[in-house]
């Protein structure tokens, strides 16, 4: 995709950016822009094609929904392999939230993802878009944004929260983005109060806002960052798991979209 086009998209997004109030743990950083475009598999093209179908508005809408359902069901979905060993999945139809659980010794591991999270939820208010604004200057110098930021290529992604807790000893929480080739970590938190750190309640969110829970992961010494990645990999929170999360998230999102279309169509009949 042309980098200037990406710039226009994110300038538009930046005007309406907000931080979600429902979860104090989700606050992804600069890698969150990695293709929400590629993440959304829906074209809605069949709806436009059927807009001139004969009949009253309700019949037209039902026909359009049926066309869209057929179109999406014909989309080729890659086979989703089983999750890495020791991980159990909590996946409820109709829910956008998927949870992976595992044990490592006396530790409880919980990885949460929300497949409906969009760009306005994934990009924080303080997101710096200046790196994109230098695109024209780079081109004038005979360079491209791809040369300047070789690791910021567009690719599939799924925001997630990684929780590692020990009963009576607190919890370590990583805000991350699962990519095809591993996890990109943005923030790391620790607290002795597991409920305060991991709960979605308003009371827990209020407590989190008043406490220092940890730094931005990118601000840590590079050696510390590497050691934290090794710590996660020892618990099988690695490239294999991140690739699975990305693929599972895409498939889950498509299935929920189809279920939604079918439910609306049934309501209209």
Curated annotation (Swiss-Prot):
GO biological process, one term: cytosolic ribosome assembly
Keyword hit for ATP-binding: no
Keywords: Cytoplasm, Mitochondrion, Transit peptide
Broad class of where this protein is predominantly found: cytoplasm
Transmembrane segments: none
Subcellular location per the Swiss-Prot or TrEMBL entry: Cytoplasm; Mitochondrion matrix
Gene3D superfamilies: Mitochondrial glycoprotein
GO cellular component labels: cytoplasm; mitochondrial matrix
Family label: Belongs to the MAM33 family.
Annotated protein name in UniProt: Mitochondrial acidic protein mam33
Native species: Schizosaccharomyces pombe (strain 972 / ATCC 24843) (Fission yeast)
């Amino acid at each position: 995709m042309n980098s200037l086009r990406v710039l226009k998209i994110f300038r538009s997004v930046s005007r309406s950016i907000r931080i979600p109030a429902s979860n104090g743990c989700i606050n992804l950083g600069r890698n969150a822009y990695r293709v929400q475009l590629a993440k959304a598999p829906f074209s809605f093209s069949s709806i436009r094609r059927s807009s001139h179908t004969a009949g009253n508005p309700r019949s037209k809408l039902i026909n359009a929904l049926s066309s869209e359902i057929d179109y999406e069901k014909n989309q080729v979905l890659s086979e989703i392999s089983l999750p890495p060993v020791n991980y159990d999945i909590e996946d409820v139809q109709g829910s956008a939230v998927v949870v992976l659980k595992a044990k490592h010794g006396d530790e409880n591991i919980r990885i949460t993802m929300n497949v409906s999270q969009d760009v306005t939820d994934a990009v924080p208010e303080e997101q710096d878009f200046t790196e994109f604004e230098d695109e024209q200057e780079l081109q004038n110098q005979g360079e491209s944004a791809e040369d300047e930021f070789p690791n910021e290529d567009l690719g599939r992604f799924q925001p997630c929260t990684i929780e590692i807790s020990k009963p009576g000893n607190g919890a370590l929480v990583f805000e991350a983005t699962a990519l095809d080739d591993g996890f990109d970590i943005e923030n790391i938190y620790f607290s002795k109060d597991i409920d305060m750190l991991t709960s979605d309640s308003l009371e827990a969110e209020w407590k989190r806002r008043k406490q220092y829970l940890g730094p931005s992961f990118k601000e840590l010494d590079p050696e510390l960052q590497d050691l934290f990645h090794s710590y996660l990999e020892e618990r099988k929170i690695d490239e294999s798991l991140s690739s699975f999360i990305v693929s599972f998230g895409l498939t889950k999102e498509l299935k929920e979209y189809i279920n939604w279309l079918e439910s609306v169509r049934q309501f209209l009949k």
